[in-house]
């Protein structure tokens, strides 16, 4: 394989499309410094995949695009194309059948870069893979740039090793090893994650096993409690039925008494209605008298205000008259001064206007002269540009024709060679076989893709279903956690309240408790536990009862009076537990309390008020011996006041008892909800396990389908690329053959025409030189005349502008003064008018004030009369109000009695309803527990005590609380976790097996790499030892390994020129280093010759003798390797079979000029 053509367009200084043909194996590029020779080497490196801007001598990759020059604009993109002759099939694989391979790269200003392989767009990696193992690449040993020859010899051992690896062809092994290491790393990461999961599952299994055993015990206790609780509720239901019968009889008696109170109340209401009519008539008389008083008082105030206003008005008028006279005098002075200024300004404007007109005429004359001079100069400039354009066109035409002649000659030779190569390549392309293989792969791909679509939809559906179940499970788990948290908080609160309640009710006093226990009363209820108080009145009841709140409820307290003598110390109160639905006064505290009748009677003569003010008012109207109490416990009686404040432990016992009952109800509700949620979670876990298994199965099938589709897609893309490349190549060959035939016919004709045009252009340029000198002399004369006219016009214009500015300023002042005088004349007229008005008002005098004084005295007399009439009307109204209050008090008493009776009846009905509701709740609870109420009641003995069953339920609850918190789902969770553990163990085994396979692959790659590297090292070392004496005319050089491990050991080179003993390569001279590096590079080429070698001024540090040795070596190796070198040395140029010159006649733009030395020599010999 060899490089046949390099095409550049827009790359660095090669802005125009440029083609460099390389027909021989020894091509030299020559030219002056800075003309762009090294840009050709950069172009080859760039198109082969170089991605570092610094290695291309730029700051960014877009710097390779031509950025413009003094005569050219920047271009938008750069393109480089390499065409390889692959007739020896050096490139294997899918491109082995192509005799010609094209590699192209394009980059635009927006940074987009694209690669093309045989006209088909591809990746950068495809280009890199194409040249793997050939010794070619953007940074391979086949491209040696300026200064790089010394860098090779001074490189670190690790960097020098890279060249040997490329020569050994193990770069592809390193790439595979890197991919395998990445897969091993991912596998180990998966193993680590899997190990963490297995460790966590193991911990969960031990924990869940303990929870499962605890859950089984808890469920057994739940079943036992369900039976006992149903029996306990059935016993309570049986007791409630007897209470309902007695309550109905008492309700009938209360309704009869209510009818009597209502009749007496209606009689009092009729008397009140008659009194209200009389009161309304009296109230109207009082309102009329009051209105008369208000009317007279208003008139009196108005007269007094008018008198004060008249006096203030007279003072303001005197002050305004004095101010107006002062302003009129000052305004007259201003008018006189401004009139004088206005006359002076008008005279100055009249004198300046003729002068300005004269300057304008002079300025117009000067401007006309300047325009004529500039027109003559513009005419000359047009002729000058025409001359320059003619000269440039003639010069460019000559250069173009000269270049064209050279190009057309080379084009004819190249077209004939390419025609022969294209014919041979077309014969080797089999398009039908490639197309048939493509159709087979495409059919398999479409079939697998259809299956993949179905599997994808199935996986998505199962993921969606699994996500919905997980979301529902999380919501239920969150709600369950919250319910448990609320229940735990409620139990803690209940325990605290019960402890406080025991202390508040005196259940912790030692002597009293012992006395009660000796009589079987230690578990008897306390007063605070059995009374119900209207909300807000708890403090008042506690203050009123005092120590009685701790009283023990017994059936007959009088029977225990004698036994109280046995109480050694402490205190105790015994209260009858009997209850009664007796009605009490609505204002009494007893009306706000439900409980033992003894407590209610104690509170019957204690009335209630919202606050102290209301209490004081109510206390004055109470019968003797009654007292009143507020919500806060402040108590007032006749001649005494008492405030009782309980300690922290005693305070709020009644309110606390209500909270205890509410908490017990709340806990029962939460426990029911907890059981429902646990059952719901168990169902979700079963569904999730099944859904997860289904999703994993579908995911596994989808993965296998994806893998199959990807492999087929890769095969399809590869085969499509082959078909497209072959088809494109055939079309291109046909087109190229047709074009080549036309090119051969037209090139000779165009060459004859170009030579004739070149002679005409040279003649024309001689004629134009004389015209140029005459035009330059005329330009100097016209420029001087134009400058004189411009200076004269500028002086006149400046004087005219100065005078115009002065005149405009004076006119502005005249207009301003005129407006000011008009405004001040108007103000003076207004001041005269105002002064006359003020004098007229002052002349009227003080006559209105005397009239107002007389009206004031009459109004005072009228006010005395109306106030006397108002007093008489109010006396009559007070008498009627006294009678109404008496009637109202009578009606209110009957109303209160009726209200109290209604409340008693309502309370009876509420008690009845409460008993019915309690019975229904008990019945519903038994049915909910799964029992029939009648069967449970009939199955219980008559002597059964509900308290015993309640205690049994409490004991079971205690055993259950000791087990809490309990995870009832632990039984199922334990089974699920065990299945998950088995699945993870299987995955762990699969991953370990895959890891062993990958590690074996690494070991195999390492063995192959070591063998290839050792063989290459030995052969290159032998080559260096043979080539070094030839290049130096003696001496000795060899390679050394820096380490023992052939996988990563570095490589150093040791050299000793003839007659020298050096200990380090750094002690060599620049030329010696260059020759040593050349020996190394050529030794590598002998082992694994790259298709071509690019040398950029490697002979720069060498003397003439060494240059000759280098040239001979290059000439000898060119039999197998194609060389393209850049040089300024004549001896190196002489070794070349073809020289291509790079010129930069146009600044910033490089062009090629090619010469075939053999052809030139042959033509010279023939002549």
From Swiss-Prot:
According to its UniProt record, where is this protein mainly located? cytoplasm
Q: Can you supply a Gene Ontology BP term from the record?
A: chromosome segregation
CDD domains per the record? ABC_SMC_barmotin (cd03278)
Q: Tell me the residue numbers annotated for binding ATP.
A: 32-39
Q: Which Pfam families match?
A: SMC_hinge, SMC_N
GO cellular-component term (any): chromosome
In which compartments does the protein localize? Cytoplasm
Q: Which GO terms describe its molecular function?
A: ATP binding; ATP hydrolysis activity; DNA binding
PANTHER family, from UniProt? STRUCTURAL MAINTENANCE OF CHROMOSOMES PROTEIN 3 (PTHR43977)
NCBIfam families named in the record: SMC_prok_B (TIGR02168)
Q: What is this protein called?
A: Chromosome partition protein Smc
Q: Which organism is it from?
A: Xanthomonas oryzae pv. oryzae (strain KACC10331 / KXO85)
């Amino acid at each position: 394989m060899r490089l046949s053509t390099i095409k550049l367009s827009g790359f660095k200084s090669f802005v125009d499309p440029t083609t460099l043909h390389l027909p021989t194996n020894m091509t030299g590029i020559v030219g002056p410094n800075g003309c762009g020779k090294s840009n050709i080497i950069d172009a080859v490196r760039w198109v082969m995949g170089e991605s570092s801007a610094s290695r291309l001598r730029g700051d960014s990759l877009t710097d390779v695009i031509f950025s413009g020059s003094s005569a050219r604009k920047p271009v938008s993109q750069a393109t480089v194309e390499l065409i390889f002759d692959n007739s020896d099939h050096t490139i294997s694989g899918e491109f082995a059948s192509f005799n010609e391979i094209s590699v192209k790269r394009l980059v635009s200003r927006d940074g987009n870069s694209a690669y093309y392989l045989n006209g088909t767009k591809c990746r950068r990696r495809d280009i890199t893979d194409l040249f793997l193992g050939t010794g070619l690449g953007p940074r391979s040993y086949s491209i040696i740039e300026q200064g790089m020859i010394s860098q090779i010899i001074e490189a670190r051992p690790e960097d020098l090793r890279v060249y040997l690896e490329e020569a050994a062809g193990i770069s592809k092994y390193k790439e595979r090893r890197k991919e395998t290491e990445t897969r091993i790393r991912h596998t180990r990461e998966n193993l680590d994650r899997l190990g963490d999961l297995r460790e966590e599952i193991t911990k969960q299994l031990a924990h869940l096993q303990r929870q499962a055993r605890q859950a089984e015990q808890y469920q057994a206790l739940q079943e036992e409690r369900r039976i006992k609780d149903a029996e306990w509720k059935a016993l309570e239901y049986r007791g409630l039925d007897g209470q309902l019968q007695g309550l109905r009889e008492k309700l009938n008696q209360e309704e009869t008494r209510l009818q009597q109170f209502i009749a007496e109340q209606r009689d009092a209401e009729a008397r009140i209605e008659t009194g209200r009519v009389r009161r309304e008539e009296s109230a109207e008389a009082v309102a009329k008298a009051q209105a008369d008083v208000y009317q007279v008082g208003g008139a009196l105030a108005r007269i007094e205000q008018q008198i004060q206003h008249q006096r203030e008005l007279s003072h303001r008028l005197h002050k305004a008259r004095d101010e107006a006279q002062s302003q009129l005098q000052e305004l007259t002075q201003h008018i006189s001064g401004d009139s004088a200024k206005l006359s002076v300004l008008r005279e100055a404007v009249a004198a300046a206007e003729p002068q300005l007109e004269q300057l304008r005429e002079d300025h117009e004359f000067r401007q006309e002269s300047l325009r004529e001079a500039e027109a003559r100069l513009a005419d000359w400039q047009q002729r000058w540009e025409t001359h320059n354009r003619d000269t440039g066109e003639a010069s460019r035409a000559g250069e173009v024709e000269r270049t064209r002649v050279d190009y057309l000659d080379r084009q004819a030779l190249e077209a004939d060679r390419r025609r022969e190569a294209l014919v041979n390549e077309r014969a080797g392309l089999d398009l039908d076989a490639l197309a048939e293989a493509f159709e087979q792969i495409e059919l398999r791909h479409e079939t697998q893709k259809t299956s993949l679509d179905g599997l994808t939809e199935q996986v998505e559906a199962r993921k969606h279903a699994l996500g919905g179940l997980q979301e529902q499970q999380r919501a239920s788990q969150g709600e369950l956690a919250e319910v448990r948290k609320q229940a735990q908080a409620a139990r803690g609160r209940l325990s605290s309240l019960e402890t406080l309640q025991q202390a508040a009710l005196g259940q912790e006093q030692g002597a009293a408790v012992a006395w009660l226990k000796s009589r079987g009363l230690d578990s008897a209820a306390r007063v605070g536990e059995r009374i119900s108080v209207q909300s807000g009145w708890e403090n008042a009841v506690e203050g009123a009862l005092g120590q009685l709140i701790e009283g023990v409820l017994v059936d007959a307290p009088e029977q225990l009076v004698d036994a109280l003598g046995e109480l050694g110390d402490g205190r105790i109160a015994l209260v009858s537990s009997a209850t009664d639905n007796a009605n009490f006064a609505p204002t009494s505290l007893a009306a706000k309390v439900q409980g033992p009748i003894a407590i209610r009677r104690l509170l019957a003569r204690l009335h209630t008020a919202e606050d102290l003010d209301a209490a004081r008012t109510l206390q004055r109207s109470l019968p003797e011996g009654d007292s009143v109490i507020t919500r806060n416990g402040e108590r007032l009686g006749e001649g005494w006041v008492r405030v009782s404040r309980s300690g922290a432990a005693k305070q709020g016992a009644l309110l606390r008892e209500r909270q205890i009952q509410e908490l017990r109800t709340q806990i029962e509700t939460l426990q029911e909800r907890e059981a429902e949620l646990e059952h719901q979670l168990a169902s979700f876990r079963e569904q999730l396990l099944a859904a997860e298994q289904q999703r994993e199965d579908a995911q596994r099938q989808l993965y296998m389908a994806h893998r199959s589709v990807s492999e087929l897609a890769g095969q399809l893309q590869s085969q499509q690329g082959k078909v497209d490349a072959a088809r494109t190549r055939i079309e291109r060959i046909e087109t190229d053959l047709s074009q080549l035939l036309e090119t051969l016919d037209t090139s000779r004709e165009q060459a004859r025409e170009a030579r004739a045009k070149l002679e005409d252009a040279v003649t024309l340029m001689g004629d134009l030189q004389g015209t140029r000198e005459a035009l330059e002399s005329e330009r100097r004369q016209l420029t001087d005349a134009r400058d004189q006219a411009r200076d004269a016009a500028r002086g006149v214009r400046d004087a005219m502008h100065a005078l115009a500015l002065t005149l405009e300023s004076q006119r502005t002042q005249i207009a301003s003064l005129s407006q000011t005088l008009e405004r001040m004349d108007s103000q003076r007229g207004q001041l005269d008018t105002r002064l006359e008005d003020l004098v007229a008002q002052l002349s009227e005098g003080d006559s209105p004030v005397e009239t107002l004084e007389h009206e004031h005295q009459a109004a005072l007399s009228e006010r005395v009369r109306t106030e006397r009439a108002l007093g008489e009307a109010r006396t009559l109204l007070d008498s009627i109000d006294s009678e109404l209050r008496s009637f109202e008090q009578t009606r209110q008493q009957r109303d209160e009695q009726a209200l109290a009776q209604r409340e008693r009846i309502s309370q009876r009905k509420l008690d009845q309803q409460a008993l019915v509701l309690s019975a229904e709740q008990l019945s519903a609870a038994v049915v909910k527990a799964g029992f029939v109420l009648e069967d449970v009641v009939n199955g219980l003995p008559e002597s059964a005590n509900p308290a015993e069953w309640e205690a049994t339920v409490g004991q079971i609850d205690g055993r259950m609380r000791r087990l809490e918190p309990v995870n009832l789902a632990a039984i199922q969770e334990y089974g699920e976790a065990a299945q998950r553990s088995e699945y993870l163990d299987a995955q762990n085994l699969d991953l370990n097996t895959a890891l062993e396979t990958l590690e074996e692959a690494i070991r195999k790659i390492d063995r192959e790499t070591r063998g290839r590297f050792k063989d290459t090292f030995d052969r290159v070392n032998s080559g260096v030892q043979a080539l070094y004496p030839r290049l130096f005319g003696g001496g000795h050089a060899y390679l050394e390994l820096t380490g023992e491990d052939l996988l990563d050991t570095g490589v150093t080179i040791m050299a000793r020129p003839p007659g020298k003993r050096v200990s380090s390569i750094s002690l060599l001279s620049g030329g010696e280093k260059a020759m040593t590096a050349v020996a190394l590079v050529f030794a590598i080429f002998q082992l694994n010759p790259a298709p071509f070698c690019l040398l950029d001024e490697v002979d720069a540090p060498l003397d003439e003798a060494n240059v000759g040795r280098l040239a001979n070596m290059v000439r000898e190796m060119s039999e197998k390797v194609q060389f393209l070198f850049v040089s300024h040395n004549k001896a190196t140029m002489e070794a070349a079979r073809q020289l291509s010159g790079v010129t930069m006649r146009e600044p910033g733009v490089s062009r090629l000029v090619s010469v075939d030395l053999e052809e030139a020599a042959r033509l010279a010999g023939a002549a």
